[in-house]
């Protein structure tokens, strides 16, 4: 925060926007731009078969109380955002021996430093895998087909079952 202030950035934490204060108000008051950091505080369903199995957990719930979960030795993390990086690192620090993170494409939401920290802690990254369903054995993926700009354009035939405890 100190570095941001030195750069001339004004910070208004814990400010409710939309009630008595609007983004237009901030711009009128001299703010050149507005960053709204809402965080990820609600679990998001994947909408796939198997996401309600006993070996499937929402990352945000796990991060709130890691000691309440017994993930096992081999953990699969679906997605590569900052919260997913936190899940991977926390799982490794809480006894998981192998944590593999999966992304549908090559573009990820996590910052480069979050990814670097997860890699230093031992997380593995697998790109080009789209989750189809989850079984008691672990996630089932389709392999993504990507164009020269690393955009997903389709999926290869067949599926790949991977093994994971959670």
Language model region names:
Residues 1, 5-44, 57-67, 71, ...:
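A Rossmann-like FAD-binding core segment of flavoenzymes
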Residues 46-50, 88-90, 113:
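Short amphipathic alpha-helical segments
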Residues 69-96:
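Rossmann-like NAD(P)H-binding beta-loop-alpha module
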